[in-house]
Amino acid sequence: MNIIGIRSSPTKIFFSIVTIEEESFSFINQELLIPVSFDTPQKLKYVRKTMLDIFNEYNIIKAGIRVTEPSADANDFRIMLEGIIQELIASSKAEIYFTGVKASIGSKLGIPNDGTISEVMDGNQPFNEIPDWKELSKEYRECLMVAFAALNLN
């Protein structure tokens, strides 16, 4: 089974594809650069089409999206990207997905929201016995965590 965890930024989409086999897993981390020369509608179309191709190529069954924490400083374009990604998931063959902020991701993973989830996301505590967890970028740590949170969906 293939699961994807996604985290967007205004300039790129980070994603981790996790393959679950029996009692083990493997993963790849990738990023999709958003062309700066495109205007906003073209950027959204590019992300939707390219990510849908990735979903189809890897036969993604479950997906998780790390969404922007609610705040007055939220980046409007990142929120648009998160919306277009949710729409493309609805158009894909994925059976189930979820969107999560830090607390809801922690809840799905059984990690308390008492500062522990932040410690794990920041790489200060291990996660799922993933080697070199601290060496991964925070964006990829979030992608992997949201992918494993999606794994727990029914």
Stretches found by the model and what they are:
Residues N2-I3, S9-N154:
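Phosphate- and other anionic-substrate recognition elements at nucleic-acid/protein interfaces
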